[in-house]
Amino acid sequence: MSKVTAPGSGPPAAASGKEKRSFSKRLFRSGRAGGGGAGGPGASGPAAPSSPSSPSSARSVGSFMSRVLKTLSTLSHLSSEGAAPDRGGLRSCFPPGPAAAPTPPPCPPPPASPAPPACAAEPVPGVAGLRNHGNTCFMNATLQCLSNTELFAEYLALGQYRAGRPEPSPDPEQPAGRGAQGQGEVTEQLAHLVRALWTLEYTPQHSRDFKTIVSKNALQYRGNSQHDAQEFLLWLLDRVHEDLNHSVKQSGQPPLKPPSETDMMPEGPSFPVCSTFVQELFQAQYRSSLTCPHCQKQSNTFDPFLCISLPIPLPHTRPLYVTVVYQGKCSHCMRIGVAVPLSGTVARLREAVSMETKIPTDQIVLTEMYYDGFHRSFCDTDDLETVHESDCIFAFETPEIFRPEGILSQRGIHLNNNLNHLKFGLDYHRLSSPTQTAAKQGKMDSPTSRAGSDKIVLLVCNRACTGQQGKRFGLPFVLHLEKTIAWDLLQKEILEKMKYFLRPTVCIQVCPFSLRVVSVVGITYLLPQEEQPLCHPIVERALKSCGPGGTAHVKLVVEWDKETRDFLFVNTEDEYIPDAESVRLQRERHHQPQTCTLSQCFQLYTKEERLAPDDAWRCPHCKQLQQGSITLSLWTLPDVLIIHLKRFRQEGDRRMKLQNMVKFPLTGLDMTPHVVKRSQSSWSLPSHWSPWRRPYGLGRDPEDYIYDLYAVCNHHGTMQGGHYTAYCKNSVDGLWYCFDDSDVQQLSEDEVCTQTAYILFYQRRTAIPSWSANSSVAGSTSSSLCEHWVSRLPGSKPASVTSAASSRRTSLASLSESVEMTGERSEDDGGFSTRPFVRSVQRQSLSSRSSVTSPLAVNENCMRPSWSLSAKLQMRSNSPSRFSGDSPIHSSASTLEKIGEAADDKVSISCFGSLRNLSSSYQEPSDSHSRREHKAVGRAPLAVMEGVFKDESDTRRLNSSVVDTQSKHSAQGDRLPPLSGPFDNNNQIAYVDQSDSVDSSPVKEVKAPSHPGSLAKKPESTTKRSPSSKGTSEPEKSLRKGRPALASQESSLSSTSPSSPLPVKVSLKPSRSRSKADSSSRGSGRHSSPAPAQPKKESSPKSQDSVSSPSPQKQKSASALTYTASSTSAKKASGPATRSPFPPGKSRTSDHSLSREGSRQSLGSDRASATSTSKPNSPRVSQARAGEGRGAGKHVRSSSMASLRSPSTSIKSGLKRDSKSEDKGLSFFKSALRQKETRRSTDLGKTALLSKKAGGSSVKSVCKNTGDDEAERGHQPPASQQPNANTTGKEQLVTKDPASAKHSLLSARKSKSSQLDSGVPSSPGGRQSAEKSSKKLSSSMQTSARPSQKPQ
């Protein structure tokens, strides 16, 4: 049997580097020559395609990983040829075998000559591109992100999705469910593709086959069209969920529904939930709350989600660019930029133009004009969303019309006249304008004048050619004329506005153009024959069509013949409009990508919105339609959080992409502010929705809301077309890579956050496996590769070093150390004795993830235990346990395989209740207590633990006589963290070194399988007779059931045959050699007692004399008695431990445990019996004294069996004291204090009286325990029905004087608690003080017991 070594010092580390290199080279060449071997590691490695005859190809890039995996796999099994093959984590790593099978192979570290460091030339598993098969970039980017989802990739690549799936039969008549596509072929192809990426065996054929299967199952993905990556991601996850759900139904497995759900919460409808791995990993729930504005009642709806689609906060304004046409003799235009709100009316645009140009709003006319002339006119009531940034908007400044009081402001006219003076000189100023004349005349009119109503505003533009093919030229302008103006004057006014465009020598004699009125209906021209053309009905109709806002106006188009235009005008094609400074400012402000944070996106997502009037909701309380307010909020969170940024928007008929920069954290995304704050009562409501992700309790770990980024899907381009890439963080080397189809480039962390990010993949920090490079506890690249799941891919040889290391250092190891089976871990701890305990629990291991179903599932270290995915799948496979219950290792493995599944099932119960339930229910069927133990579910032991520590503090305060000695150890134990308290106390009991069993030791004769019944039946019989088991809760019952078994276990540990001194292995002990010496000394002093069953009240003069004889050996014996009796309590009466199941000639473990556990009134009682009857055992005593080092590794197999059969082995010593035993302990301490005080007053008669009074209250309990001993004789096996001659007589002594027995129990308990509450061995000085106090107590107990023994 190989010995478990610490990390870094295994047998492979001792081998020379040269031998390993040559061995790995030979192994690699042989594997290549045979084509990688059937099922060998080479079958899944990159070396298979290489040429077997080329020596240079053996050192190629693609073959490096295969050689490393082969070497590690073979080196780990040089010493264990018969190991079972690795099944990818689906089953336990322990090989099946009989009860006496050797311990599983050790977990050595990587070889001494590590692989060369990864560089750019060496391939990294998972870093491989995907071929683009025609616009499949959306598929490639999504697959790369899923491939780097650690737990999902492990689940697919290791084939764990096949658990429980029936083998496909070739029978054509087999029902196909959904047809050919109903057999999970999408999941199968996805698993093949992911496996090829991580084994570096990818070829374009893999992705081509996957696309073919996808197109076969989803018609929309046929062809080479572009698609949205988020839509494909949701489709793929949903399809994998359906495939897994279909396989579960085919296998006949019941849905993963908590069995106690309907029992605890009967209200509300109940429905079965088929939970799959996709749901457990990606799915969570959000809550939609609808609040009535009248009665404030709230209606909640809960819905699941796989992906959160977050809106991107948009800027509150958007830019619009308007060309302003100023009023004046010469048309002066300028382009300005204004910011308008996202929603509103055109009045906001008019106000913005007015603020920018200082023109009054009632003098601004907004129209739309393109190359062919006028189009729309805008009024104030028009929707602003109908005006887009690319529209050509013109704002005409019109002259101010007469106000009601008849005052006309000439601001615009004078301003533009000044501009005309500067620009065009005095020649133009000398021309008389009818408009200016009319304005001057109007200014002098009386307030009652109606002259203003006779004027009309004309918006004029020029257009070459007639009909629909014309094109606008020149600048538009404004005319303010009388309605009754004649045709000739109208023609002159138009030519006057265009005079500076005319050639200098041209003299116009006749009308060269025609006038067209832009009306609502049809095309209407003004004829020259009309005396007053502006009085035409079409003009009146155009004026009436103008909406509110601005000045009423008429749009005229002056249409010129092309030859006439070329003859009269010059430079008409150069229509230059300057831009104001505001245009540049608005472009910089709005066209640059807006920056926001991911937290702002969540705030916008959870923002309260008011329902529209059309969506009014009938309140069930008010019975009326109400415009309620709706709020979305996150109710639960998944382990893998997928966030989709809504970059694509549909605005009417236009679709656009938001290029906003969303800043997201790479690590430490805290989701606490975005999760619903729940009260105590709301955690359990409602009962009918989603039991797979129901929240429990208020004591959630804050780490559950912390997420780290591991992948980003990017979209480059616009809404019409673009390209997808993926940024992923590799779990082997922890580096970021950019996957652009088949091109892969390394990326720095600063380059991950870009404005092209589209889908974000976050992983819960507590769900990151320990083997991942993304974990905070992960080691170097080589060590993480050794523990990575890639090393356990199908096709590898018997469980490789990486498989063994990861499987034992992860969920199974952490599970067994944190909750169950601590005693059996001594055989295969995988180096945990030298490794911090927190690592194995805080981080998950292979195929394991944090159990978030129950936040109350916290172990004694205030951490939630890790449930192995392999353990869940093992139970889901519905196969019986393949281990016989005789071996502690196998029972531990089979029990652990079923713990995680049941813990996820019973989400409404504390994990401890489930663990106690399973640890007992999966014992051997012959154990009679297993059926009763199966019902032990109730309140979590956290409350029990609080009560225990409270009782311990009370007991410490009562113990005033030995407060100096007790306070040191008790205070030390209180200061220590939980990891050094309960676990080490348990290790002192059951953590026996089983790695050094010597075949020649006499202990080998004690066969564990010969006594399973007695050890299993004692807890049952004791529990049945316990009077305190009626009024207590079921967890306390389960705790008490474990105590008698632990008593027998402890006795077998502490009082084995003299040849096995039985050292106690403590992981935190500073000196191992010192513990061995002490244990051997204890063994020589303890195991020399000839009496198999020392009575509780045996206090002969010889034993009293031996107390007074001081010797170093007695001090060691006293320390041993105090140190090893770690988990016994006052309730462990001597009755169950008195009947020894072993023959007297072989081992006196249980019989002698009575003298150590029951009496303890005299430390010298063992010594006295040893001196009187040490002749038969003297050779063994000398052997034990001489062979200290050899005896340190020996053990009694029955002790392991006792710890295995005990349903509550891992319940710590503090948890083993219930209220009944605490009452007895208090009475014992009180009697002890009284005895000691009265002894100091040297009043022996009074001492006897007080002791009898103090012990009278517990006589019935001790007598009843004696009756239990009598009743339990019928349960003993035939080998155990050979009591010694003096056993019966000594039991009668117990019934005669119960008070003194309580005192002796008190002595043991006080000395025991002072040593074990600290969690670690005390210093030499502290140990001596503890020994002195135990000697004083024992002598005081003897002195007080003398008067009570005289009548006997």
Curated annotation (Swiss-Prot):
InterPro entries: Papain-like_cys_pep_sf, Peptidase_C19_UCH, Ub_carboxyl-term_hydrolase, USP_CS, USP_dom. Residues 1-62, 79-119, 162-185, 812-835, 919-939, 951-1352 are annotated as: Disordered. Residues 95-117 have a biased composition (Pro residues). It is an enzyme of class 3 (hydrolase). Residues 958-970, 1160-1181, 1278-1290, 1341-1352 have a biased composition (Polar residues). Residues 32-43 have a biased composition (Gly residues). The modification N6-acetyllysine is found at K1264. Residues 1148-1159, 1215-1225, 1234-1243 have a biased composition (Basic and acidic residues). Acetylated at Lys-1264. Acetylation decreases activity. Deacetylated by SIRT1. It catalyses: Thiol-dependent hydrolysis of ester, thioester, amide, peptide and isopeptide bonds formed by the C-terminal Gly of ubiquitin (a 76-residue protein attached to proteins as an intracellular targeting signal). Deubiquitinase that recognizes and hydrolyzes the peptide bond at the C-terminal Gly of ubiquitin. May play a role in the regulation of NF-kappa-B signaling pathway by deubiquitinating TRAF2. (Microbial infection) Plays a positive role in foot-and-mouth disease and classical swine fever viral infection. Mechanistically, associates with internal ribosomal entry site (IRES) element within the 5'-untranslated region of viral genomes to promote translation of the virus-encoded polyprotein. This is Ubiquitin carboxyl-terminal hydrolase 31. It comes from Homo sapiens (Human). The lineage of its organism: Eukaryota, Metazoa, Chordata, Craniata, Vertebrata.
